[in-house]
Amino acid sequence: MTMQAVADAVGVRAPSLYKRLDGRSALIRAIADDVARELGGATAPALELEDPGEAIRALAGHYRGFAHRSPGAYQLLFSNLLPEASPSAEANAAAAAGLLQLTERLVRRERSLQAARLLTAFAHGFVSMELAGAFRLGGDVDEAYGFGIDAIIEGLRISGAER
């Protein structure tokens, strides 16, 4: 990706990009921040759902759908090939805020980060394998994803009951 290619794609001259961004690294960071915020913005409708399990299911479905609609943008978030491709701390915090609120409904507040990491690790691992075509044993992949999310929600509910 070059500044010239981006300028051409958005219909401006490359020098005008440099007025807004401090080079290619800043451009990539801005894209990563935008992707993180877009993914995090999906929590808003889920937060309106009363049942936390349903809310997490809705969020997990959006997460997976986003990865399928925008695999390049999705992979950018989790790549360590370019340090500048990591979203800023502010964008990461904004992206995670809704998920943390949802997990706090199921577990003690001090465990919500661990619960959010568990959900993210499962969803990311599953989606990454799915995008790579790694599920080769047959069966319904949609059903498998739902089963995994449901199992995690049930485990979190049990853990949360120990408050």
Question: What are the residue ranges of the model-derived segments?
Answer:
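Amphipathic C-terminal alpha-helical segment
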Residues: 121-138, 154-162
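An amphipathic alpha-helix adjacent to DNA-recognition modules
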Residues: 11, 20-44, 57, 61, ...
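Amphipathic alpha-helical packing segments from all-alpha helical-bundle domains
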Residues: 84-118, 142-154
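Amphipathic alpha-helical segments used for helix-helix packing
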Residues: 68-86, 128-136
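Short alpha-helical functional segments enriched in proximate histidine and acidic residues
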Residues: 38, 42, 66, 102, ...
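Hydrophobic alpha-helical connector segments
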Residues: 44-73, 93, 116-119
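Append "Primarily bacterial transcriptional regulators
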Residues: 5-8, 17
